[in-house]
């Protein structure tokens, strides 16, 4: 799953404290749905997803994006037990929603992009490396039920 050094943990926690969960969550999920349109099939109940502007302005996309990043906050508090932290969500996404686990990796990569946009120069290569390790670990934990 990847071992987090104390430096990784400090880097992730420090940046996370500055993240606006609502804004970053909505933008991350919105970008996922625009850039990877096949992911939209999991969000039929969200209404109008017909264009980039419709998706980015959709209140249900924003609300679910906030929910996703809120659960990521739980992961950040439990970096040494990502699998345990996401056991129930893994089961839900695998058994009930049948989400392709590759989508977790895509979402993590989109989040890293959004953080880079929001934090600019502060999002150094070292910060990116720690965050990439974290989103990869989260994707792996969410995919654990599939194995």
Swiss-Prot record:
GO terms for molecular function: haptoglobin binding; heme binding; hemoglobin alpha binding; metal ion binding; organic acid binding; oxygen binding; oxygen carrier activity; peroxidase activity. The modification Phosphothreonine is found at residue 13. The keyword Magnesium does not apply. Keywords: Acetylation, Heme, Iron, Metal-binding, Oxygen transport, Phosphoprotein, S-nitrosylation, Transport. InterPro entries: Globin (IPR000971), Globin-like_sf (IPR009050), Globin/Proto (IPR012292), Hemoglobin_b (IPR002337), Hemoglobin_oxygen_transport (IPR050056). GO terms for biological process: hydrogen peroxide catabolic process. The modification N-acetylglycine is found at residue 2. Residues 3-147 form the Globin domain. Red blood cells. Heterotetramer of two alpha chains and two gamma chains in fetal hemoglobin (Hb F). This is Hemoglobin subunit gamma-1. It comes from Pongo pygmaeus. The lineage of its organism: Eukaryota, Metazoa, Chordata, Craniata, Vertebrata.
